[in-house]
Amino acid sequence: MNYTDINAKTVDSWVQNGWKWGRPISHETFEKAKNGEWGVYLTPTKIVPHEWFGEMRGKKILGLASGGGQQIPVFTALGADCTVLDYSTEQLKREEEVGKREGYTPKCVRADMTKPLPFADESFDLIFNPVSNCYIEELEPVWRECARVLKPGGVLL
């Protein structure tokens, strides 16, 4: 078993045991986001400034290692076209739970971000990658793939 498989199983276990980053947003939080009241975390301590995102409606967003039902549902509520890629089955289940509750079908992809991403070149306007790169051995291939799937002028957070 390679280290990314071990990581996925570990994260699955954390989520099953109530891990903070595996608890999906509430219906109330989703509704507030639809009305423009929202905040998401990229790191554990500070909400990302809205200015970093620009207009969200219609923006194609990849949540890279961003399962858990926290950020991607907020972006969806704001009108973005979102895809979430995560290696944790439990994190993707949380995305699906929020989608079912809120009446949309999330685009969930179970994949390893250390491998070539299963998307065409220039597919996304923005990639949102909350704390996850500390769990992998080599960053350069991940950043190279992000550059490939970002549209010209796209943003990686």
Residue ranges of model-derived segments:
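N-terminal, positively charged/glycine-rich alpha-helical extensions of SAM-dependent methyltransferases
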Residues: 1-31
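Conserved alpha-helix/loop element of class I SAM-dependent methyltransferases that forms part
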Residues: 24-59
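Class I SAM-dependent methyltransferase SAM/SAH-binding core
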Residues: 59-116
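Residues that mark the start of a beta-strand
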Residues: 60-62, 123, 151
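A short acidic, Gly/Pro-enriched loop at the edge of an enzyme's catalytic core
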Residues: 114-127
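A short SAM/SAH-binding and catalytic strip from SAM-dependent methyltransferases
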Residues: 125-140
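A short glycine-rich, Lys/Arg-flanked "PGG" loop and its adjoining helix->strand segment in the class I
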Residues: 140-155
